[in-house]
Amino acid sequence: MILLISDLHLQEERPDISRAFLDLLDGRARHAKALYILGDFFEAWIGDDAMTPFQQSICQAMRRLSDSGTAIYLMHGNRDFLIGQAFCDAAGCTLLSDPSVIELGGEQVLLMHGDTLCTRDLGYMKMRRLLRNPLSLWILRHLPLSARYKLARKLRSESRTQVRMKSTEIVDVTPEEVPKVMAAHGVRTLVHGHTHRPAIHKLVVDGQPARRIVLGDWDRRGWALQVDEQGFQLAPFEFS
C-alpha cells in the first residue's frame, strides 16, 4: 500500500489537523510501504534553521515512522519551498523533485504539487519564478530570521487576498496545460494537490484515456489517495 497526501498546511493554530496527521503516522501509514506528501505540508516554512518546537515535534513523529520501515517522500509546495536537506535528514524523508515520475500501481505516474499547472494565474507564476530561482533562494535562506518572519507573513496575507479576488478559473489548473505536461512525461496518470479541489478527472492524452487525480486539502477533514491491489482510491476521512 502507498499513501499520497498534500496541502495539510500544518500550523500551531490548527491542532486538529496536526493530531489527524500524527494519527495517520501512528495508524494507516505504519502499514504503508511509502507515504508521499505533495507540497504545502506546512502553512509556512522560513528555513530549517528556524524550526519551532511544534515543527520539531512533527519532524520527530516522521522520523519514528521512517525508522519503522515506511519510506517518506516530501515535495515542496508554494508555502514551504524553503524546506531543505537538514529537515529531511532529521525527519528521515527524501526530498522529491517537482515534477517526478514514479512507478505506482503498475504504471508510471506523474507527481506534482500542482501550482505550475495554473498558468493563467500570471501574477502568481511571475512571483514563483522570482522566488524559486537559485539566487533568490540563497538570499532568502540567509536573511535574518526577523526579516524572514516578516516576509512570510506578508506573502501569506497577499496570497489570501489574491485568491479571494481572482476567479476560480484563474486559480485552477489550465485545462490545456494538463495533457501537454502528461504527454511530455509519457504518463496516463497525474496526481497533484494545490487547488484544494479533490476529484478524479478523466481526459485524453495522445489519443489514450488518462486521468488526473487531485488530492484534497486538510481543513474540516483529511484526504488521502491509497494505492493498493484494489487500485487508486481517493477518499476523505474525519478527524477523530
From Swiss-Prot:
Keyword hit for Lipid metabolism: yes
Cofactor: Mn(2+)
InterPro entries noted in UniProt: Calcineurin-like_PHP_ApaH, LpxH-like, Metallo-depent_PP-like, UDP-diacylglucosamine_Hdrlase
Predominant cellular place of this UniProt entry's protein: membrane
Pathway linked to the protein: Glycolipid biosynthesis; lipid IV(A) biosynthesis; lipid IV(A) from (3R)-3-hydroxytetradecanoyl-[acyl-carrier-protein] and UDP-N-acetyl-alpha-D-glucosamine: step 4/6
Subcellular location: Cell inner membrane
Residues noted as binding Mn(2+) 2 in the record, renumbered to the chain: D40, N78, H113, H194
Cross-referenced SUPFAM superfamilies: Metallo-dependent phosphatases
Keywords: Cell inner membrane, Cell membrane, Hydrolase, Lipid A biosynthesis, Lipid biosynthesis, Lipid metabolism, Manganese, Membrane, Metal-binding
Cofactor: how bound: Binds 2 Mn(2+) ions per subunit in a binuclear metal center.
Residues the entry annotates as binding Mn(2+) 1: D7, H9, D40, H196
Binding-site residues, substrate: N78, R79, D121, S159, K166, H194
Catalytic reaction equation(s): UDP-2-N,3-O-bis[(3R)-3-hydroxytetradecanoyl]-alpha-D-glucosamine + H2O = 2-N,3-O-bis[(3R)-3-hydroxytetradecanoyl]-alpha-D-glucosaminyl 1-phosphate + UMP + 2 H(+)
A Gene Ontology molecular function term of the record: manganese ion binding
Pfam families: Metallophos
Highest taxon listed in the record's lineage: Bacteria
EC number: 3.6.1.54
Membrane-topology annotation of the record: Peripheral membrane protein
A single cellular component GO annotation: cytoplasm
Record HAMAP family: LpxH
Family: Belongs to the LpxH family.
Job of this protein: Hydrolyzes the pyrophosphate bond of UDP-2,3-diacylglucosamine to yield 2,3-diacylglucosamine 1-phosphate (lipid X) and UMP by catalyzing the attack of water at the alpha-P atom. Involved in the biosynthesis of lipid A, a phosphorylated glycolipid that anchors the lipopolysaccharide to the outer membrane of the cell.
UniProt protein name: UDP-2,3-diacylglucosamine hydrolase
Gene name for this UniProt entry: lpxH
